[in-house]
Amino acid sequence: MEIISVLLCTYNEPLKYLKLSIESILSQTYTNIQLIIVNDNPKRADMADLLAAYAREDSRIKYIVNPSNIGLVSSLNAGLKNAIGKYIARMDADDIATKDRLEKQLEFLQVKSYDIVGCNAIKIDENGKEIGYLNVPTAHEKIKEYQLYGGCVLHPTWLGKREVFEKLEGYRSVY
């Protein structure tokens, strides 16, 4: 089984959401993962303690603490530099992945020979109640059309080949 490196950057998310986010990745049906957690708020002791405890408890976690707040793009690039997986996935620190997200996305990516895939999302409120859906286009022409208006990939839902990010040299700070 190929390794999927999951990038999760955090700055000031409430701990209850951060825990749910981490647990949703650690409990995936696809278990050959590396969860890279980048802490971009080293002054927040409660978060640092929680993340360090997770890293001690699960060897799949690579925990990185930025020396100061460097922003999301630089944090993502720091995570990419530490990724060991053939595939890279994104996860936000206040989102919850379905149990089979990575398994389904990897299967779809491999069967279709795509470089990157994303998915729709269910919107939930602070109590976990479903309040709506974020649907993205799947037809090639619709995807091209949406690109004119800012894109259609929900960033924390994608999974892609590592080679794509190497070719692009990571995230660009100009966006």
Which stretches of residues belong to each language-model region?
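N-proximal low-complexity "stem/linker" segments adjacent to membrane-targeting elements
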Residues: 1-26
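Glycine-rich, basic loop-to-helix element that forms the pyrophosphate-binding segment
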Residues: 66-83, 104
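Conserved donor NDP-sugar-binding/catalytic core segment of glycosyltransferases
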Residues: 100-132
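Conserved nucleotide-sugar donor-binding catalytic segment
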Residues: 6, 81, 138-175
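Acidic donor-binding segment of Leloir-type glycosyltransferases
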Residues: 22-65
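Short aromatic/hydrophobic "clamp" motif used to bind/position activated sugar donors
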Residues: 88
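Acidic donor-diphosphate engagement hotspot in glycosyltransferases and nucleotidyltransferases
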Residues: 17, 46-47, 76, 97-102, ...
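The conserved acidic donor/metal-binding loop of glycosyltransferases
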Residues: 92-96, 120
